[in-house]
From Swiss-Prot:
Gene3D superfamilies: Cytochrome c-like domain. It comes from the Bacteria. This is Cytochrome c2. InterPro entries: Cyt_c-like_dom, Cyt_c-like_dom_sf, Cyt_c_1A/1B. Heme c binds at residues 19, 22-23, 84. Binds 1 heme c group covalently per subunit. Belongs to the cytochrome c family. Pfam families: Cytochrom_C.
């Protein structure tokens, strides 16, 4: 299904309680996972200074809101072999909120 409207304020809270374990929202600052600053609209596997999995590099994905909505639900299903260990967020509203926040990071 398609994403419900997201709330970037709630998304920021979710990012800073869930995503922050492996990612940052700061340009150029990678952790276990790559920085998600500017991720919306970016091609997968290209954040400088991050050692991506071959699966992510070769996926050919562009991180549109729709793709992120599906990926955050089932990362391993969308990019089999991804290093992302997060099992996924089943709640569509939480996914939409996180994406709404990611869209503000530019």
């Amino acid at each position: 299904g398609s994403a419900p409207p997201g709330d970037p304020v709630e998304g920021k809270h979710l990012f800073h309680t869930i995503c922050i374990l492996c990612h940052t929202d700061i340009k150029g600052r990678n952790k276990v996972g790559p920085s998600l600053y500017g991720v919306v609209g970016r091609h997968s596997g290209i954040e400088p200074g991050y050692n991506y999995s071959e699966a992510n590099i070769k996926s050919g994905i562009v991180w549109t809101p729709d793709v992120l909505f599906k990926y955050i639900e089932h990362p391993q299903k969308i990019v089999p072999g991804t290093k992302m260990g997060y099992p996924g967020q089943p709640d569509p509203q939480k996914r939409a909120d996180i994406i709404a926040y990611l869209e503000t990071l530019k």
